[in-house]
């Protein structure tokens, strides 16, 4: 199997990165705004700690940081903040500004031009599915999404997740 060079945006503590790394793929950059998550990720990936960045995606895109990866990355993946989309959020804050951060993820994808894109989130983000697919299509990708039951894939959780891929 070919080794995939990947970037993980909204990496959190590194669940997606861990899975890809475990399969032999190469983490090139991981970014999250939460410093506690970044500390955890650096402990789990000590040899990659220089490529694990505590950064706001909005600033990253506006300041045009890390563009040296343009056309060198196979996959950009990420799980944009889900609080406003989550059914566990009893207030279900549809106007939560974090609900729009996926747009900055897509803007970074547009700048880096990876071969593939993977977005993971709660099922509530389906309200943005048409916009996500349209934006990916506008930058040259053929995108789709699937609803997946986490426990069907060995994850000890009984919850559904949505995956956009192209």
What label would you give each PLM region?
Residues 55, 60:
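Cofactor-binding loops of NAD(P)H-dependent oxidoreductases
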């Amino acid at each position: 199997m070919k080794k995939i060079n990947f970037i993980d945006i909204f990496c959190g503590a590194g669940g997606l990165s861990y899975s890809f790394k475990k399969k032999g793929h190469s983490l090139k950059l991981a970014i999250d705004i939460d410093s506690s998550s970044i500390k955890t990720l650096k402990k789990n990936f000590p040899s990659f700690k220089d490529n694990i960045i505590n950064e706001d995606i909005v600033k990253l895109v506006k300041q045009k940081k890390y563009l040296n990866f343009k056309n060198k990355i196979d996959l950009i993946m990420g799980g944009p903040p889900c609080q406003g989309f989550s059914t566990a959020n009893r207030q279900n804050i549809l106007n939560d500004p974090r609900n729009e951060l996926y747009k900055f993820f897509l803007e970074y994808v547009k700048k880096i031009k990876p071969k593939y894109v993977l977005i993971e989130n709660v099922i509530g983000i389906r309200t943005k599915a048409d916009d996500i697919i349209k934006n990916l299509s506008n930058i040259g990708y053929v995108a789709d999404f699937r609803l997946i039951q986490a426990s069907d894939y060995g994850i000890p959780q009984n919850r559904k997740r949505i995956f956009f891929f192209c």
